[in-house]
Structure formats: structure tokens, C-alpha cells
Amino acid sequence: MEKIIFATGNEHKMIEIRAILSDLGAEILSQKEAGIKADVVEDGATFEENAMIKATEIAKIANQMPEYKNAVVLADDSGLEIDYLNKEPGIYSARYMGEDTSYRIKNANLIERLNGVPDEKRTARFVC
């Protein structure tokens, strides 16, 4: 059975990935489930660069492990871009206001920053 390692520690993301890839008939593992303990520095300038950095680093480690030598390694990076805020938080979405800050507090801060901004200028997107 083909093995696919997804370069993430995010359990919610793994639920989504397994649902999307369920028809492949492959064993789908998070990097944690594969026993890969790496804290990859996402220092790219774009979502795509960060995904490539993660996939490359995790693949290097997996390639050293006999059970994952031929595994496929996938990664993504995603985040919220708010046009009025010059596409903030963007690639920093996960780290916006600190990684330990709850989404509720982060969202409240973003809404506060948009206070007084007309609805038609409150455009945003989730980039993945």
C-alpha cells in the first residue's frame, strides 16, 4: 500500500485531508503519526513557498526511514487575506497575535481593526 505523509501537526487538517484523499486507497499519515518530529521553519514569502519548504524538509527526514523511503510527502500552507489590511494576516495567519492566542481572540482583533470600514471594503479570502 502506498504511503502518503502530510507535513502537518494539525489534527483538524488531517481529518480534511483523509476525507479528500479517501478514494486513493493509500495509507495517509501525519508527520507525527510517521514518527517525524520536526519543527520546520516556514520562512517563505508566499503560501506556496512555505508548503514547498515543509514538504521538502519532511521528505528529507522520511527518506532516511526505511518504512517511508518511498512515501509521497505533501504539504500545504493556508491563511486569511483581508484586502483592507494589505492582505494581513496572510502567511502569518497561524502565528498572528501568537500561536497560543485563540481564534476567537484573533478574530475579535481583526474585526476591531476593521471597525468603521464600509462593508464593500471588507473583502477577504481564505487562501490554500
What does each model-identified segment do?
Residues 2-5, 11-128:
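Anionic-ligand binding patches
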